[in-house]
Amino acid sequence: YASRPIPAMQGLDRGERVIYVGTFSRTVAPSIRMAYLILPPALLEVYRAKFGHAAATVSRLEQEALRRFLASGAYSRHLRRVGNLYRRRRDALVSRLEPWGEVRGAEAGLHLLFTLPGREEKELVAQAARAGYRVRGLGEYCLKARPIPGTLVLGFAGLAEEKAEEAIAENRDFLDA
């Protein structure tokens, strides 16, 4: 959100070895159960030989509707719209969190790291849960490295801009502790 997207891996790949696997469930709607696989030309025939017999479980009608959605440019417009929406949500949350701690990793993605200096991660997670928020501590994502103490992983995709101020106001005691 803070800069232009990084180039696609396929565009950087000189040996045609990049494979893309994804789904439209997160970018369009959870009910769309369609995935995609983009293979380099050299692997396409191997894939067809090994897996060509597997029948698609998605109806042709749904596939055609998605094909038209993609071909019309509507999907690209949708991604731009939601990107702008997520940027506004991120900005609203970051501006309200910065007075209490350090925000990291907000440049891209739908999560950020929020550090409250001098606080214990487990207690922060427990306090957030008591206040009705589902958050995780950074330590849950670390196998060997020691996480930054007092750091929460906060998602903002589902946080409406106007709710950011409300959430901070409701939790001033938690933030000030």
Predicted regions and their residues:
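Conserved glycine-rich beta-strand-loop-beta hairpin in the small C-terminal domain of fold type I
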Residues: 67, 83-94, 102-115, 127
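Short helix-loop capping/hinge motifs at secondary-structure junctions, enriched
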Residues: 15, 41-46, 76
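PLP-dependent enzyme catalytic core of the Aspartate aminotransferase-like
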Residues: 130, 146-177
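Active-site pre-lysine segment of PLP-dependent enzymes
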Residues: 1-27
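Structural signature of PLP-dependent enzymes
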Residues: 47-54, 70-94
